[in-house]
């Protein structure tokens, strides 16, 4: 868990959710700096959550944000398992349907923004519905 200084000067522990929210906000700012346009964050559908939904031109991008302190055990990008990919695909499918779309009618892709230590890696088209 990360720590943050408080007014009293003694650091306090961030919750896992607060840490995740902070890295997602960092990823959003970083991607906006690369020209992507923000659509939504922390989108919940039955059985899953998508960290960020952004747009690049006509492409809707579903983004999973991961953070790991070190590359031990494969680092942040390696933590997006097949099971997690399946949940993201299902969540995106439901979100698209709620917005009158589908994988057949909307140009979309699945990216991963992985923070490992001080390094950031943007994996475009990390997986798809044909994987």
From Swiss-Prot:
One of its GO terms (molecular function) is nucleic acid binding. Coiled coil: none annotated. Gene3D superfamilies: 3.40.1350.10. Residues 1-19 have a biased composition (Polar residues). Residues 1-21 are annotated as: Disordered. InterPro entries: Restrct_endonuc-II-like, tRNA_endonuc-like_dom_sf, UPF0102_YraN-like. Belongs to the UPF0102 family. This is UPF0102 protein YraN. It comes from Escherichia coli O127:H6 (strain E2348/69 / EPEC). The gene is yraN.
